[in-house]
Amino acid sequence: MAAAGATLHCRAMETMLLLLPDVAMVALGLLLSRGNGWDRRFWDGLEKLVYFVLFPALLFNSILKAPLSIGSAAPVMASAVAVVGAGIVLGWLAARVLKPDPVRFASGVQTAFRFNSYVAFALAQRIGGEAGLALCAMLAGIIVPMVNVAAVLALARNAGGGWWNAILRNPLVMATLGGMAGNALGLVLPEPVSASITRLGTAALATGLLTVGAGLVIKSEPAAGDRSTTSMTVWFTVVKLLLMPALAMLATTLVPMAPLERTILVMFAAMPTASTCYILATRMGGDGAYVARLVTLSMVASLATVPVWLALVR
């Protein structure tokens, strides 16, 4: 028992060291966003650049060049859908059990099942190289539209039109599907085009992590809330950081998977919630301040939980 505990501790420390460069980039983004004259408009513009240009370039290029077998990856992809589906259901249970403020619930429930893709892709690349990155991209290609639809449906009562089209035109989904199609067809890009896309993709992870740090809320006005709001905050955080990775661990024992697939699945499920939850909530008339606190709590708490989950699965 003592030996097993020592092994787990060593693996957790190894994972902490693996996470350290990404945590440092997030911390740098936080520092740069505070008091240096770069206002919110700068960071919003940078986030758009990452989301619409740099990140899609990274995904497309990684999947296009990776030795993929979509058929053999079907078990891990199906497991990811099941885990995220369970997270959506568990998140929605808070409305029935806690009877919280409807607007605050609709705004915050997305944090129980959405994931921070910038951190996920950065860590997947460090764990499994291009193969890990490509596998993570394949999972994201399925999960991104799934969680976006669930998040939008929760906020739909306050939303305007056009959101279904926005989901269908999601740049990350389009890049992933395009890369998978090109890979299946054996597409080889001309060298100048390939080099240009590679350079754009190289800038994606570091820039994306900087925007995550810039979006963290360290101090804000307290939300007008009650016990149900506090309970809901804990509920969403527990679902995202504890229950979803636990379900992913269970899936790895029930479904045959390669070692890298097991690791990426659990890592994917253990990720903190998406920093863009705040953007969606505010654009659809929700409680943006509450969501900003949820995002920050998830990011900070994940520094303790992610190393443990990865140590358990590796």
Protein language model annotation of sequence segments:
Residues 2-314:
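Alpha-helical transmembrane segments of multi-pass small-molecule/ion transporters
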